[in-house]
Amino acid sequence: MHLDVQDLRDFYYRTRLGRVAQRAIRDQMLRLWPPAAGHTVAGFGFAVPLLRPYLAEARRVVGLMPGPQGVMPWPAGMQNVSVLCEENNWPLPTGLVDRLAVMHGLETSENPSAVLDEAHRVLGPGGRALFVVPNRAGLWSRRDATPFGFGRPYSNAQLEAQLRRHGFTPERSLTVLHAPPSQTPFWLRTADAWEKLGRRLPWLSGGVLMVEASKQVYAPTRGGLGAVVKKPLRVLEGIGQGAAKPALNPRAGQD
């Protein structure tokens, strides 16, 4: 079940722990995807805290929010780019998106297959998707004081297997939020140091799993002109069907 948009907004924008989490996840996303001019960047779930750095250079930015969650205007002080949508019917053309971030949209969905099918549909050739979910092995999935304590936590193997079943190829995976989900001043002050330590020690499990995936594009199963030309040209007919007609009339020039 999706969380309410007001609860998500209050956590990420009105608590110190939420701002720490937002910064850690967004910084890691920027390492994977530096802003690039001309890209269409979209987010599904409650991914808008990750999208602000792309507003300046992207061709367009879209924040898709599922109906059960609700929607809020975003970004503040600018033209709204957030849209309310159904999980299985995103209001985007097929192949439009270059970069797609999914946060609080998969683990809380009652139909994750529909979410992944739509993610695959809207992603264009060469596009990348980033799935941000609670890490089954981390502390954040075990406390309901944060949004990552709700829904289904994933292991890396579970998430990658689910992505492959829906036509994605996992490219990179990592964890973030290595400090515990605590409002204690010590942990909040040292959160950045824990993130740096986590990047140096891959075995140190963070509270949130991030998996980057590309869209698989399959070659057509049929080849040759028959696959694309319903009625072959007449010049190709008769090849291999016996002797060809003579190129010249044998009586030509005798009249």
Swiss-Prot record:
* Highest taxon, organism lineage: Bacteria
**Which SUPFAM superfamilies does this chain map to?**
S-adenosyl-L-methionine-dependent methyltransferases (SSF53335)
**GO MF terms held by the record:** S-adenosylmethionine-dependent methyltransferase activity
Q: What protein does this entry describe? A: ATP synthase subunits region ORF 4
